[in-house]
C-alpha cells in the first residue's frame, strides 16, 4: 500500500510564537492530506507492482461485508496522540507522556520550547463491541507495544510457546516523529500571511501495524464432494505483537485464527470453481517492520507459514487440510492474497472425521491432518 502522510501544522500568532518554557500556551496541530490506499501497493519484484485483483477469485459480496467489513483498509478519522517532551536533548528517553484523542483533523495542545517526540495512532472502531488489541504503555515510556491474547482455537503448527491460536488484531496504523524542535527563533517555521500565523509542518508517514491477508482454497471438479467449511481457519508463523513506534513485529511466532466461508460456482477464468475464502489481520513477519520494507529482498523471514482449513464432505465427515504457504507469505510481506488449489478428481472423500483423505500428499503432518506444499 502507498504510505499516507499526516501533515501536522503547528500554528501560533504573529509576531510572537507565544510558547514559553514556564508557561506553555496553546498551539494548533492540523492534519492534512490524509489518504490511505484501500489495498496493497508494493513491488513483488524489481519494477513489478503487486496486482492482487488478478489473483482474487473469491469475490466480496454483502455477506462477506457483514462478516468482515471492507475487503481492504479503511481510512481512520479518530486518532490518539502521545507527546513526549525531552527538553533541550533530542532523542532522549521519555520520562512523561501527554495523551490526547482527536476527532477529525485538528488538535489543540500546549508545547514548551525544546524537543518533542510525537506518536500518532488510530483509535479502534469495533464492529461487535469487543476489542482484541491490547496496548502496553506502562512497561516503558519509550515505546508502546500492541498484542492480542490466545483464543479457544488450538494452535497446531509453528507456535512453539503457545497451545492456542491468537485472536486477530484490528486495523491499526501509526506514525512516529522524534526530535521535533519548537524554537523561539522560528527555525523550521513558515509564516502564513493569510492567517497571520507561524506554521511548523511535520509530514509524518502513516504506516500499517497490522496487515490484511485474503485466503482462498480453490476447489476444482468438486461435483458436490465438499459441501462447506467449519467456519474457522488458522495461519501460522506471524508475530505475536508489534511496536507502534517502529512498526517492528515481535520475535514470538504464533498462529492467528480467523473466519472462513464457502462459496459455490465462483468464476475462475471461465471455469466454475468452489472456494473456501477468508480474511484476516496479523502483526506481520517476526522481527520485521513490514510496512517500511521496499522489496522482498529485504525479507529475512525464517518461520514456516501453514494455513489450515476444515472442510465438510457430503458424507458428513469433516477433514482439516494444512497447506504450506511460506513462500507466498514471504512474497506478500505486506499482506495480500494467499491461494491454494485442490483438484477433487485426485482426492478421495474421507471415511473418518478429522482425516484429510488426501492420497496425494507430500508427507503426513500428524495423524488427523496432512501438510500440502504448494
Describe every region a protein language model picked out.
Residues 167, 171-268:
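A sequence/structural signal for flexible, mid-protein segments enriched
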Residues 31, 117-119, 201-203, 214-216, ...:
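Beta-strand secondary-structure signal
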Residues 66-131, 226-330:
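Tryptophan-paired
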Residues 11-144, 330-374:
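Acidic/polar, low-complexity intrinsically disordered N-terminal segments immediately downstream
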Residues 87-207:
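Short, low-hydrophobicity acidic/polar segments
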Residues 35-41, 123-125, 218-222, 312-317:
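Short, flexible beta-strand-to-coil junctions
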Residues 1-12:
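Sec-dependent bacterial lipoprotein signal peptides
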